Amino acid sequence: MPQITVDYSASLDEDFDRRGFALALHPLVVETVDARLAACKTRTRRAEETVIGDDAADDALVHVGIHLLTGRGDEAKARLTEAVIALVPEYVKPAEGRVLHVSAEVHDLDPSYRLR
């Protein structure tokens, strides 16, 4: 039941292949934490405003949050986080002067989670 949310800076609208990233991310999640491909769900959210540091540079942010059913160990979650961080730049076109900040986190879904 991976529920995946990708937040990204508005400045990446034309430079971030969000669909391509999701389609590459799903098999990575399956391999790393033993999920089912058909269960992977990703939604992207454009952040209208992103302020990083003193806002002096042309920085951009991609943050990936992954929520899984319980049962995965901390090591598997850490491997997935590192793999996600490595994958993101492959789907963002480089731009002169831009610094891309990438972060990721993996959490267990709340026990109240239900799916229909």
Report residues per predicted region:
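A domain-level signal for the structural core that forms small-molecule/cofactor-binding pockets
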Residues: 1-116
